[in-house]
Amino acid sequence: FYNKTNKTMSTNTGHPKGLYLLFFTEMWERFSYYGMRAIFILFMTKALLMKGADASNVYGSFTGLVYLTPLLGGYIADRFWGNRRSILIGGLLMALGQFLMFLSGSTVIDGMESASSVSMMWAGLTFLIIGNGFFKPNISTMVGQLYPKGDHRIDGAFTIFYMGINLGAFFAPLICGGIGDTGN
């Protein structure tokens, strides 16, 4: 991926411009993920009227699968698709998953769950899990591919990249949790 003739360096930091694209992409992906997680139990118990134990089981299963699927997504990227295609497909699947989660909440009428709400929630979770599997292991790899082997700037690049992850993870629960909990 590294190209010696690539002149797309930021004049301010000495890092490739692609690093900042990856920084913001990952920051917003983490914001989306942790923001959804911040209100997911509330959504299942308040809007879909699930029992707390059932909602906790769904939440735990979702979280576990989100951390398991990158093993398969990384393998598919390494063997067949490559990083870019895997990130693109994963991002699109996660966007579709978030959209379906939004729609599942939009079909709840006066606190009464409908079969379509629950079905859309499950479809949304499925797309989020699969999309994350393709997205997560490959975007970090692309940070390393921006630099030639042995480049001293790579440590700083990963620090910048992980700062994006942490910013998204920090602000998402505060913002989405504050907006999502209406006190009902």
Language-model region placement:
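Cytosolic juxtamembrane N-terminal segment immediately preceding the first transmembrane helix
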Residues: 3-30, 115-117
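Hydrophobic core of transmembrane alpha-helices in multi-pass small-molecule transporters
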Residues: 27, 97, 111-135
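Short amphipathic helix-loop junctions that connect adjacent transmembrane helices
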Residues: 38-56
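Interfacial helix-cap and linker-helix signal at transmembrane-aqueous boundaries
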Residues: 44-45, 76-80, 175-183
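Central cavity-lining transmembrane alpha-helices of secondary-active solute carriers
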Residues: 60-78, 170
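Glycine-rich segments within core transmembrane alpha-helices of 12-TM secondary carriers
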Residues: 65-66, 155-181
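Cytoplasmic membrane-interface "Motif A"-like loop-to-helix N-cap segments
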Residues: 79-93
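C-terminal ends and interior cores of transmembrane alpha-helices
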Residues: 89-116
